[in-house]
């Protein structure tokens, strides 16, 4: 995956975060790697601000795969090149309205262009989680800039979070899934 940077930003559980990154690197050669353990990124708000306003400066490939200590690759054989046809793909949020369910940012694939747009002055920054700001609050702005969100049908093969299914997904997010996946 030489056009994808593997990225993790974590100053709360850096050892677990590095382990998650290493799990991903066992299966793929990435075009870049970013691990940021900055003591100033110590809250949800600081994390959101960094992801939305600073991450693009660290990405030198067309895409970035964001992983967290509790969200990483679990089925490398489930990789699909169609994931790269979109600027954003993450796990489906079943509680959002149809057509707006993609998705979770804890394990997500994003284009560098999307990351640059989230740092632009036109992107309305709020105190919501960064993935909600991208996928809901600023979605119309982003789509007007040509950003493409993956369809729910494809996102179900990329990752899962709260929605349980029998699909063998590429990755997952959420420590509440560890037991189900046999991860400890």
Roles of regions detected by a PLM:
Residues 33, 69-70, 111, 134:
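Generic structural signal for small/hydrophobic residues in well-ordered secondary structure
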Residues 71-102:
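Conserved donor-nucleotide/metal-binding helix-loop-beta segment in metal-dependent transferases, i.e.
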């Amino acid at each position: 995956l030489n056009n994808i940077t593997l990225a993790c930003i974590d100053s709360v559980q850096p050892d677990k975060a590095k382990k998650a990154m290493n799990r991903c690197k066992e299966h793929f050669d990435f075009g870049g790697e970013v691990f940021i353990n900055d003591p100033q990124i110590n809250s949800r708000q600081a994390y959101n601000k960094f992801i939305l306003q600073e991450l693009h400066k660290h990405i030198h490939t067309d895409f970035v795969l964001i992983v967290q200590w509790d969200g990483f690759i679990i089925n490398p054989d489930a990789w699909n090149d169609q994931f790269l046809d979109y600027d954003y793909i993450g796990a489906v949020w079943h509680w959002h309205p149809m057509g707006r369910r993609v998705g979770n940012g804890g394990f997500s694939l994003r284009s560098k262009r999307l990351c640059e747009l989230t740092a632009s002055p036109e992107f309305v920054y709020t105190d919501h989680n960064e993935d909600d700001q991208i996928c809901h609050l600023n979605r119309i702005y982003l789509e007007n800039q040509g950003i493409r969100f993956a369809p729910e049908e494809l996102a179900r093969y990329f990752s899962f979070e709260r929605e349980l299914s029998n699909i063998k997904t590429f990755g997952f997010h959420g420590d509440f899934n560890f037991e189900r996946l046999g991860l400890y």
